[in-house]
């Protein structure tokens, strides 16, 4: 269990206690701090005496990337399965037991992803729902969906990072070790999205339709900062380009609609016009996209109920 932290002293105790309260007890805890300036280190040092804690690593200089801490924690880990338990989140006591049992049941699965309740800074449950499960997902037997990894990329991760919170995932370390390109760890905003794409290439993906994770929402996040500057969109374009080069069977209509969704996103960004123009040019050069893709995306979204063969992001989801 890797707990990477940066300036979340106010949530650390709840995070660590929610790990110690797990009904599955065969685990080690790796505590990481990325040069916090609050009271984090004293809290981490207090918990370092717990027999479950195998490592406490405190950086003297901030890395500038949350994903660099992921890589560090994974390199220190000794277990078969890895849970990156973000320091501001929490979990239900049955989370690990459920996740590990699923990975044992499906030995070809590279990771399993469980649902989340969204909570605020005080721990109150919010109505926000990032899972967005429909009858398609909830009608599956045993509250689970089991997918071929490449199909999961094509129909799900090509459109967006459905794996919206690392704290909701347990993955197989052996599958991580098969990844050859770890450029995701040097990214600032969307490295987690690329990470799950690379993990999905290593085996099957299992979704568990139970909300056993608690995902804390903040007013300011790294992702939102990236959207404000446009840098997050640049990283997203890079990721979609990677997918299109690695999967040959995406299909022309799916590509067109996906490119159109980028045009829509850029149009709606609250950034200066010159940044929008720069992003539009970058989109065209990177993905060979053009403005007509935007109108195809809008048409498909408006009329897919009438013409079921039209592809949209939501309809394409497995």
Residue ranges and their predicted role:
Residues 59-77, 90, 98:
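Glycine-rich, basic loop-to-helix element that forms the pyrophosphate-binding segment
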Residues 92, 114, 134-236:
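Conserved nucleotide-sugar donor-binding catalytic segment
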Residues 18, 25, 33-42, 61-63, ...:
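A conserved acidic beta->alpha catalytic loop
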Residues 13, 38-46, 90, 94:
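Acidic helix N-cap motif at the loop->helix transition within catalytic regions
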Residues 82:
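Short aromatic/hydrophobic "clamp" motif used to bind/position activated sugar donors
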Residues 94-135:
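Conserved donor NDP-sugar-binding/catalytic core segment of glycosyltransferases
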Residues 8-21:
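Short, well-formed alpha-helical segments that are part of the catalytic scaffolds
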Residues 245, 264-318:
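Membrane-interface aromatic/basic loop that binds lipid-linked glycans or pyrophosphate carriers
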């Amino acid at each position: 269990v890797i707990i990477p932290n940066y300036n979340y002293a106010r949530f650390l105790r709840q995070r660590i206690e929610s790990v110690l309260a797990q009904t599955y007890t065969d685990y080690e805890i790796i505590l990481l701090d990325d040069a916090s300036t609050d009271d984090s280190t004293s809290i981490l040092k207090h918990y370092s005496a717990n027999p479950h804690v195998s490592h406490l690593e405190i950086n003297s200089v901030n890395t500038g990337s949350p994903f660099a801490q992921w890589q560090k924690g994974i390199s220190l880990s000794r277990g078969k399965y890895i849970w990156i338990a973000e320091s501001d989140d929490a979990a239900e006591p049955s989370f690990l037991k459920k996740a590990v049992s699923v990975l044992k049941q499906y030995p070809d699965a590279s990771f399993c992803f469980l649902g989340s309740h969204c909570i605020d800074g005080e721990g109150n449950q919010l109505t926000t729902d990032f899972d967005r499960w429909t009858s398609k997902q909830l009608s599956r037997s045993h509250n689970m969906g089991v997918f071929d990894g490449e199909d999961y990329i094509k129909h799900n991760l090509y459109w967006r990072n459905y794996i919206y919170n690392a704290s909701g995932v347990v993955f197989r370390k052996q599958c991580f070790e098969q990844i050859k390109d770890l450029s995701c760890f040097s990214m600032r905003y969307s490295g987690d999205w690329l990470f799950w794409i690379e993990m999905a290439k290593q085996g099957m993906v299992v979704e568990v339709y139970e909300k056993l994770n608690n995902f804390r929402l903040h007013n300011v996040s790294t992702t939102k900062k990236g959207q404000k500057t446009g840098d997050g969109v640049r990283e997203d374009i890079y990721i979609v380009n990677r997918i299109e080069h690695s999967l040959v069977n995406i299909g022309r209509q799916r590509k067109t609609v996906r490119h159109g969704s980028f045009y829509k996103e850029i149009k709606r960004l609250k950034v200066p016009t010159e940044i929008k123009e720069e992003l539009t040019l970058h989109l065209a050069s990177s993905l060979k996209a053009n403005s007509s893709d935007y109108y195809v995306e809008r048409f498909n979204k408006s009329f897919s109920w009438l013409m079921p063969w039209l592809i949209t992001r939501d309809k394409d989801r497995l």
